[in-house]
């Protein structure tokens, strides 16, 4: 009995060594080097790309941002994005929205330049759609060369005619090398028309959990894996031709298909709607500033080098700082407007104006 027990134990040992039952397979998987997310030096990056306040500068040099979004149902999102850009330090902020949304958005703030140019299907006859689509594009293109960055998607909605018009606007922005930050329903549009951004290095996608899931399913044909989150994000960014993706989460993960950076600055446990809109405006401003600095000075002696990645890191960091500060004051009653009001102080704490 003892001998047979010893033999049995030895057989068990050999089975474990050979990997039956999956133990050696698990060891093998663990031994494979995985892509690791590098914690970004976010505050130093933010300082490096934020322009100084100089009396010699004129209106517009600190950034001109345009938000493409806003329809009958959704007027808050484009306002949050556009006003956040101004609160951070952009000089001018435009909103291109539908005619129904324009009076509402204008009433929120006189600081925004609101263009009631977009149309939805219900207000356009079938025989007029082509002519109106061309007219919308012509009117928006008149402004395009003035902008340092577009934000596409906040409050856009999913009306087919409206999305078709926005697709043409995005194509023209790409031809003009205007950076594009894509959020909200802009991500719905892009997920179904990847060619709009595929291979465009000045595009930034800012998906939340569900938007990211749809992108992964569409591009990688698999489910989201949290254990290999950095590796999967890297593959996704590569799969869309090197666009920059800011995956929102407990820590924001950012990749352009070359590296993966994380921003783990503590934000807020309060998940009120509209925070993604603040982030899109924030990323747009910092992307514009990073690009301006790189064009003017060349190597900024910071890493990473890509303006889209730098802008995403800085935008994420500031948004998180502001959310944390707002939560300290308002706790459970924290709203998006409270976070917006903390953007200026949060930036001042990191990068004091001189």
From Swiss-Prot:
Signal peptide: none annotated. (6S)-NADPHX binds at residues 155, 208-214, 277. It comes from the Eukaryota. Its cofactor is Mg(2+). Disulfide bonds: none annotated. GO terms for biological process: metabolite repair; nicotinamide nucleotide metabolic process. One of its GO terms (molecular function) is ATP-dependent NAD(P)H-hydrate dehydratase activity. Keywords: ATP-binding, Lyase, NAD, NADP, Nucleotide-binding, Phosphoprotein. CDD domains: YXKO-related. It is an enzyme of class 4 (lyase). Residues 42-350 form the YjeF C-terminal domain. The keyword Nucleotide-binding applies. It catalyses: (6S)-NADHX + ATP = ADP + phosphate + NADH + H(+); (6S)-NADPHX + ATP = ADP + phosphate + NADPH + H(+). Catalyzes the dehydration of the S-form of NAD(P)HX at the expense of ATP, which is converted to ADP. Together with NAD(P)HX epimerase, which catalyzes the epimerization of the S- and R-forms, the enzyme allows the repair of both epimers of NAD(P)HX, a damaged form of NAD(P)H that is a result of enzymatic or heat-dependent hydration. Belongs to the NnrD/CARKD family. PANTHER family: ATP-DEPENDENT (S)-NAD(P)H-HYDRATE DEHYDRATASE (PTHR12592:SF0), ATP-DEPENDENT (S)-NAD(P)H-HYDRATE DEHYDRATASE FAMILY MEMBER (PTHR12592). This is ATP-dependent (S)-NAD(P)H-hydrate dehydratase. The lineage of its organism: Eukaryota, Viridiplantae, Streptophyta, Embryophyta, Tracheophyta.
